[in-house]
């Protein structure tokens, strides 16, 4: 369902008389309140977990010789990820290859904590040591920090999670899989039920929302991994 369809379905499920909305743009009063509840429900679902797999995407950028850090942004010398759409790095997904060679020369990059990176690669003469980077870190400002500092063009790739976003146009479609779209409707029903003192609507929304969220949590989050046995 798109944004408009979600709003229409919410009105129907809440038992609100009348029809519509016919658009999500330029509404007022009760219809605008309904539209806001749907958008709030969508935001609530997105922010329940930062690492929903439908928020995960991949970025690539090319290093600049003698430049160790790459800030968020889309201009020259950045990591190519817009601040507006960035949510969180998936730090265990980074790799690189010499740009001139191609991905036949690809290697994984180990993540290290920022203080370790700073004390290792940004100290004394090591600041000026340039070669192929084999480790990476994330600064407090969410910049990508490479170690050692690259000595030429390397293509860096890694995954990150998109920031939560609101819907604004009739045809906007939420990013979560279609089989879970009704979770937005059920969560919006809870807002309607609380506002209108309609416990039957609230309780039905809460029950069905809980069912879908449990399924989504089991199906759409990274698999849990376990540490090896202690020596």
What are these regions (language model features)?
Residues 1-231:
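Glycine-enriched, solvent-exposed interface loops adjoining structured elements
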């Amino acid at each position: 369902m798109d944004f408009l369809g979600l709003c229409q379905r919410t009105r129907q499920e809440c038992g609100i008389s009348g029809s519509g909305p016919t658009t999500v743009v330029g509404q007022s009063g009760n219809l605008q309140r309904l539209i806001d509840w749907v958008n709030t429900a969508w935001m609530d679902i997105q922010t329940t977990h930062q690492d929903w797999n439908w928020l995960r995407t991949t970025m690539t950028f090319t290093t600049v010789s003698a430049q160790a850090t790459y800030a968020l942004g889309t201009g020259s010398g950045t990591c190519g990820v817009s601040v507006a759409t960035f949510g969180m790095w998936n730090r265990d997904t980074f790799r690189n290859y010499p740009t001139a060679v191609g991905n036949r020369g690809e290697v994984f990059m180990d993540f290290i904590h920022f203080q370790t990176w700073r004390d290792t690669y940004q100290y004394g003469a090591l600041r000026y040591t340039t070669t192929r980077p084999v480790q990476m870190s994330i600064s407090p400002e969410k910049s990508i920090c490479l170690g050692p500092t690259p000595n030429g063009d390397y293509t860096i790739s890694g995954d990150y999670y998109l920031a939560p976003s609101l819907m604004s146009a009739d045809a906007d479609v939420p990013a979560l899989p279609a089989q879970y779209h009704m979770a937005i409707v059920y969560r919006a029903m809870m807002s309607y039920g609380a506002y209108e003192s309609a416990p039957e609507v609230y309780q039905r929304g809460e029950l069905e929302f809980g069912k879908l969220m449990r399924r989504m949590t089991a199906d759409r989050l990274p698999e849990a991994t376990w540490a090896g046995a202690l020596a």
